[in-house]
Amino acid sequence: ESILFFETSDNKVYAHTTDEFFEVKFKLYELEQIIPFYYCRISKSSIINTKVIYSLEKSFSGSSTASFYDSKKQVHISRHYYKILKDKLKEMR
């Protein structure tokens, strides 16, 4: 649960914690098969831990951002995955 999100950058996958990040030796699609159910894909390049989301902000342009408890980090949510994330959060209540 200490991992806030996974993200790809330069063909590498990184796991982000509250104040650091480290490289992971899996592809995102491989991670989706092995991480707990409360993680959710939010873009082609990111998977988020839904248990640590503090807020979701949606702008007029349609882009969205997730913020986390106890961290200044934020992550972009693509329009395509926004509803999937919202449904996942409702399901977990």
What are these regions (language model features)?
Residues 1-70, 74:
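Conserved binding/recognition cores within well-folded domains
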Residues 38, 80-81:
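Intrinsically disordered, low-complexity N-terminal regions enriched in serine/proline/glycine
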Residues 72, 76-77, 83-84:
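C-terminal structural segments of small proteins and small subunits
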Residues 84-93:
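Charged phosphate-binding loop/patch that engages nucleotide di/tri-phosphates or the phosphate backbone
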